[in-house]
Amino acid sequence: MKFLVNVALVFYGRVHFLHLCVHFLHLWAPEPEPAPEAEAEADAEADPEAGIGAVLKVLTTGLPALISWIKRKRQQG
């Protein structure tokens, strides 16, 4: 029984050591370059003002056009 416990401890120690080696290799590995599409998406997500600006642009240009279209339709009957 003592032999099996020793074997289990040695096995656990080796697995733990290999896990640490892989962890450190992962930390030291250079990060891959992001794809251009991913950078554009990240920029859009990082700047919430850009989304609000787009909404405001649609409202300021589209809303008056919509109001004038509704007025024309009412005048036509």
Curated annotation (Swiss-Prot):
Location in or out of the cell: Secreted; Target cell membrane
Record's signal peptide: 1-30
Pfam families associated with the record: Melittin
Location (main, coarse): secreted
GO biological process: killing of cells of another organism; monoatomic ion transport
Coiled-coil segments: none
Disulfide-bonded cysteines: none
InterPro entries on file: Melittin/Api_allergen
Residue numbers of Glutamine amide PTMs: Q76
Tissues expressing the protein: Expressed by the venom gland.
Propeptide residue range(s): 31-50
Residues annotated as site: Important for the flexibility at the center of the helix, flexibility that is important for the stability of the voltage-gated pore: P64
GO cellular component, one term: other organism cell membrane
GO molecular function terms attached to this record: porin activity; protein kinase inhibitor activity; toxin activity
Residues carrying N-formylglycine: G51
Family: Belongs to the melittin family.
Function: Main toxin of bee venom with strong hemolytic activity and antimicrobial activity. It has enhancing effects on bee venom phospholipase A2 activity. This amphipathic toxin binds to negatively charged membrane surface and forms pore by inserting into lipid bilayers inducing the leakage of ions and molecules and the enhancement of permeability that ultimately leads to cell lysis. It acts as a voltage-gated pore with higher selectivity for anions over cations. The ion conductance has been shown to be voltage-dependent.
Protein name: Melittin
Organism: Apis cerana
